[in-house]
Amino acid sequence: MKNITFWICILIWVFITLVRVIFHQPWFDESNAWEIARNMHFGNMFESVKYEGHFFAWYFLLMPFAKLNFGYPFSMTLINWSFCFASIVVLWRFAPFNNFLKALITFSFPFLACYPVVARCYSIGILPIFLLCVLYKNRLKYPVIYSLLVVFAMNTSIIAFLSSCLLGIFLLFDLFKQENKKDFKICLGIAGIAFFTILIQILNFSTDKLPIAKVFGFNLQTMLSTFVLLNPLINAILLLIFAIGFCVCLFKDKQMFAYVIFVFVAILTLFKVTYSGDFWHYYFLYVTLISACWIAFCEDKISEKCKKCLTYLLCLLSFLLIFDFRNEISVFNSNSKEVANYIKEHKNDCSIFLNQIFFMTLPYIRDGKTDYDIKIIDNSNGTYNIGLDFESIMYNLEPNKNNYIYINSCAKIPNLIKGEKVMKFELDKNIKNLYCIYKVDIEK
């Protein structure tokens, strides 16, 4: 019966997520990672953190496919999906939870709709964290493998770094207490190399390079609506119950109690001082709770009563996340392919791109199946703010009076006046109420 439940759940999960992956069109964050992997080499790989705020592992995995311009977007989305699929299999095979809780986690919004579909660096960080949970009880028997998993998890994203580094510190602390220091020295050497690679990337980090870094302070409303789609007051009460319940039940397992407190404080501090975070970032708090309960159950340092209480809390939290569909449209309907197709149809026009559409459509345009001259796009000087970069826009539009400007808002664009020159915008096409494409004419 246990195997039947697993196969039913996993087959349903595979079908739903693969259908989502097939029809998913990447957003800016996804396509931008592809462009970074395409344009960088191993020597400057660590510099990507200054633009993205995440570490190099995801770009390293994408690099062979991006440089060959092979199979976009499916080579990228299937790599991402494979890591999430492996995480689900590991959960079902090794997690000390009952089948009901495993099913709830499997079909929660993060694991059914977000992480397996949106190809970012987060899914590849969940797998090593789950594998660390599997090895945690026997970490002293397999210290090198455990250490390498920590290093890999730390280099996937800053969020996964905060969620895994303390698990590595726990290993070093336990190895140091042993009489034979050989394993401690080996793992300390691995930790030193990992610290060096992380340090190189952090030293390259600059909040000035991240536009979102200017948004200081985490969004309380976003945080309160991350786990449950209810009234904000009810959300706050439920989150308070979850916080008290998890802390009380995990208190006797000092390491897992410290782990949960550290990760929550570190991630929320990151959102406070660097960037505000969004729902996919806050979902890693959910991953942290799953991991902490997983390890606490295996370590057997808490009572059976606490285990039951934690199971009920995780079931309730996972159940509420199943109905979290408020981000359905924003996650799955970027329509970047439709915009790219429109650009191809007008390949002889000079184009101006506003906001993030240039990078979102670029991999589709550079698909090797068209005679489109990509230099026409590259010569548009990338992303503009109409108000601030008027002179640059005028310079690029001057050779051709009829041009197209792409924006990701359907709001009416006013005519702009600079000296004796007027830019007039005429709506040419509306793509699924997400993008307006305007003809631009310059009058002197």
Residue ranges: model-predicted function:
Residues 7-11, 78-100, 247:
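Transmembrane-helix motifs of polytopic, lipid-linked glycan transferases
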Residues 34-36, 42-43, 48-82:
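Short hydrophobic/aromatic helix or loop-helix immediately within or flanking a transmembrane segment
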Residues 117-123:
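Short acidic/glycine- and proline-prone juxtamembrane loop motifs at membrane-interface regions
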Residues 328-337, 345-393, 399-414:
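Short periplasmic/luminal acceptor-recognition loop of GT-C membrane glycosyltransferases, typified by
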Residues 393-444:
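Aromatic/acidic, Gly/Pro-rich catalytic loop(s) in extracytoplasmic/lumenal soluble domains
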